[in-house]
Each structure stands twice: as C-alpha cells, then as structure tokens.
Amino acid sequence: MTTADVKVGIGVWDMHFPNHNQKLWENVLRVIGDIKPDFFVFGGDNLDMDAVNHWEIDKGNKRGMEGKRLRKAYDDYNSEIMDQFNGSLPDYCRKLWLKGNHELWLEQYIDKIPELEGFAEIERNVKLDGWELYDYRQTVKIGKIYFHHGEYTCKYHASKMADVFEKNMVIGHLHTLQVHTKVTPIDGEAHSVYSMPCACDMNPRYMKDKPSAWVNGFGVFYIMPNGNFNIYPVISSKDHFVFNGKYY
C-alpha cells in the first residue's frame, strides 16, 4: 500500500448558515484546495433554519423572528456557500449532505402547514446536484467510519453514542470536541466516537453570552483500503489553525 491508496476526506458539522463562522469557512476552502479530498461531508445543521424555528414560533417571539424568510435563507446559502463550494471540490470527490435536527425543524413546520409539501423542502431548494442527501438520524459508512449528525445532548455524549451504536462514528450536534473509545472484552475490538467541533458563530443571539464548551473547527479523515482510518479534528482558535504543517 502507498499513500496514493489512502482516501482523504473533510467534514464540517453544525455550520448553521447564515450564523456561521465565515473566516473558518474560507480557511476550510483553502484546505480543500491544498489536499483535494476524495470525499466531503456536511454533517448536519448546515442551515440554521431560523425562519422555521419552532422554539421561537411556539413562544410567540415575533421580535426574534422578524425578517426571517426561508426563501432568502435558501437563496443566500446557494449563492454564498454552494455555488462557490461546488466549484472548489475535485470532480472525483464524493459529496455527502446530512440533515441535522435543525433541518428537521422544516419537516415539523410542514407537518403543521402541509400545503407547503413539495415546495419548501431542502432537496427542492438547495443546489444538491451530485450530492448524496441523508435524512436526520441516517448514517453513511465510509471505510470503517459511520458518519452521523449526532443524537444526544448529555455531558458525555460521545460515550453515550459509543454505548448505543457500538460503531466507529463521527458526529457533531454538541458543537464541541469529545472522543470516547469502547473496547469489548470478547475480542478486544475497539470502537471510537469522535464528536467534531462546529463551524458556526460561537455566540449566536439565543446564547446571550452564556458560557459553553463550544469550539470552532472541522475534521480531516484518512481511510486506508482495508477501511482502517485516522481521524484528525482541527480546532480553529481565534479564526486560525495549523494543519499538515501549514498555518491558515
């Protein structure tokens, strides 16, 4: 086996567009240009979907919802992210777009207003030609890694995922870096769950300056022909990081 046989991928979780970290995103594009990935994963909560935020709608928070429009969110995401991004990836790159719980908000909204069915869905509005689209809670396997948005919100969420799924997984959802490994006593096989940092604004309006464990960053994955892998979470501190010996 040579280095050329190893597949490399990049994953971004919890972008929450338009409430994303633009500087981090620009640096991710630079990394893409440098390593030319074989696959790319948008890991869910790619769109914030704040125009259909059921928490604010159910509270009757008209001030918080003022000016939020789903059409504008789609148009801006396409022009500011997908148009630029699709031209940055190599033609051979496998592209995966996972839905997260924020994308699920839209389905919950359509449940209440079913007349929107067939018009408002992500697959009808986001430029996803050439992308594999996965619903919330679906997993996709590459090598021996299962990619998933994330499920639990407890303090030790990576441990919880390892206990329930018993697979090697990469998740997001909690906006922080966490790793847990579970080893079975039967044959010594290990399963690790990596919770990735987020690509969103670290202090959105609803956080109201509340302390958190959130960190910005993304993931880089190397997968060998037998499915074995190495996972490298990349943490961005004050909009900068070093990856593969290069300062971004």
Show where each model-derived region lies.
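N-terminal active-site segment of His-dependent metallophosphoesterases
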Residues: 1-82, 244-248
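Active-site neighborhood of divalent metal-dependent phosphoester bond hydrolases
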Residues: 52-136
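Active-site metal-binding loops of divalent metal-dependent hydrolases
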Residues: 13-16, 44-47, 101-103, 150-152, ...
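A short acidic (Asp/Glu
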Residues: 21-22, 50-54, 106-111, 158-159, ...
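Hydrophobic/aromatic residues located in beta-strands of well-ordered beta-sheets
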Residues: 40, 95-97, 193
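Flexible, charged surface loops at secondary-structure boundaries
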Residues: 3-4, 33-36, 89-91, 127, ...
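Charge-rich, low-complexity terminal tails
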Residues: 98-102, 108-110, 234-248
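Conserved beta-sheet core of the metallophosphoesterase superfamily
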Residues: 144-240
